[in-house]
Amino acid sequence: MIQVLLVTISLAVFPYQGSSVILESGNVNDYEVVYPRKVTALPKGAVQPKYEDTMQYEFKVNGEPVVLHLEKNKGLFSEDYSETHYSPDGREITTYPTVEDHCYYHGRIENDADSTASISACNGLKGHFKLQGEMYLIEPLKLPDSEAHAVFKYENVEKEDEAPKMCGVTQNWESYEPIKKASQSNLTPEQQRYLNAKKYVKLFLVADYIMYLKYGRNLTAVRTRMYDIVNVITPIYHRMNIHVALVGLEIWSNTDKIIVQSSADVTLNLFGNWRATDLLRRKSHDNAQLLTGINFNGPTAGLAYLGGICNTMYSAGIVQDHSKIHHLVAIAMAHEMGHNLGMDHDKDTCTCGTRPCVMAGALSCEASFLFSDCSQKDHREFLIKNMPQCILKKPLKTDVVSPAVCGNYFVEVGEECDCGSPRTCRDPCCDATTCKLRQGAQCAEGLCCDQCRFKGAGTECRAAKDECDMADVCTGRSAECTDSFQRNGQPCKNNNGYCYNGKCPIMADQCIALFGPSATVSQDACFQFNREGNHYGYCRKEQNTKIACEPQDVKCGRLYCFPNSPENKNPCNIYYSPNDEDKGMVLPGTKCADGKACSNGQCVDVTTPY
């Protein structure tokens, strides 16, 4: 039986009072009225787009001039972004809006190297910026025919609950497998390549029915709230070499699709099940987060599965819309996503150069946008041990359904490279303004690209990982390093297995992966359970019916292992999860007898599976 780690986060609650404008709550002690002046960089006579790629505003804070530089967050949305809501009679309505001309920006303050900004410019400037180490909020004042904005320090927002909030970590029988510590030394070439690769999290957000009611049954208001939150999350993860893109948004505008309740662990379990059985069938994504207007029991404001990324059920989290200040909700969501990505709560010794950090167990009223050294170590260990594959997959050019956007780090149709904005790009091979290769460059990235040129034909670009793999070489005509491997069916691991698609699957290794380093394969008698045709033993499924193994096929069904641990001396053990029944089956290509290997639940001649 596997254990699941449910990780909760608790924080002070700011009750919603009917408006998204913080000033109207009466919780701001002191603010300054400013009149931001836009400084245009467009040449005279040029056509000005609704929302420019870069903008600059000037205003005064504490009597001192401030210049705010903004760049559009071009990676905010994926190219196949979709939105779903429901009609009063329950009909699903899905649209694919064009979102490249959006109004969400990141930025900095001129002459302040430590400054940051996350701003919505949809109707005036709304968001936060960091100036000389202090956090400020800015939002338009609701005055007729006026460009007046309010600027106030975050510390001047009165907190309605100053009591410390503790975070709880619970364990439940039906949960994701615990994080296993990995050695930081002696990485295999495959692990090192994985660590160096860019990571992409394709995020899907869901707003429940209470959120819809909370924002006045206004789809635009709910949508704006979600956009504001993701605009804060993306730069937090960009520092970790993780690109977060919003692939979809769903608003439960007629009724909830699950029973959202104050018990956070029950709600998370229901949401994970709904994602696995419903949402994933409609929309491909890597991680889903539910934003709810309900109050969870106790101080809990969020909950997530530790290490669940890429799992059909456990790559999920739930977050309470606990504050009028959207960046506090965004940090809570970034925290829950951090748990999905293998990060545990920070200890007292953890540091990020400021306090607190994103993965603090109890979020104080001091906002932080940095991961601690402990979080970075947790994440690295998780990646090394598990190597989740979904976050390596960036959108394919052929999947793009809206116009390409230069500067979003995704190479799309019509682009030769994409290294981000002109300010952030550090790629000497790529012209960030056009997303084309610079003059004389043949490539910008790839294992067969070196200093903007193709490596010579025959140059080794990837070493053989094991005896079933082959060293890969460059062609001299491409930046790609095509993967190749030894012929299938070739004996491997001292004749204990046969090569299968570049790997050598044997039962002994599979038992160790499931039950730990001391595990061994069970005796032959245990495999006779596979003749029963139930969840304890079967060979394959047909139309969701478990088919019992024939006598000669029993070693191609469920894998039986002996954990050989102090707490488990049972000689016949299976790995079983009701939400992922196929995990724990003998892998395809595994040797089941001399000259035979498993294929579709049958022990067949070794040449047949290939």
Swiss-Prot record:
Binding site for Ca(2+) 2: V405, N408, F410, E412, E415, D418
Sequence similarity: Belongs to the venom metalloproteinase (M12B) family. P-III subfamily.
SMART domains: ACR, DISIN
Extent of the signal sequence: 1-20
Residue ranges of every copy of the Peptidase M12B domain listed in the record: 199-395
Pfam families reported for this sequence: ADAM_CR, Disintegrin, Pep_M12B_propep, Reprolysin
UniProt-listed PANTHER family: ADAM A DISINTEGRIN AND METALLOPROTEASE DOMAIN, DISINTEGRIN AND METALLOPROTEINASE DOMAIN-CONTAINING PROTEIN 28
Record flagged with keyword Transcription: no
Residue ranges of the motif D/ECD-tripeptide: 467-469
GO biological process: proteolysis
Species per Swiss-Prot/TrEMBL record: Crotalus adamanteus (Eastern diamondback rattlesnake)
Protein name, per record: Zinc metalloproteinase-disintegrin-like 4a
Cofactor details (free text): Binds 1 zinc ion per subunit.
Entry GO MF terms: metal ion binding; metalloendopeptidase activity; toxin activity
Summary of the function given for this chain in its UniProt record: Snake venom metalloproteinase that impairs hemostasis in the envenomed animal.
Glycosylation sites: N218
Further facts: The disintegrin domain belongs to the long disintegrin subfamily.
Active-site residues, record numbering mapped to chain: E336
Cofactor needs: Zn(2+)
Main localization category: secreted
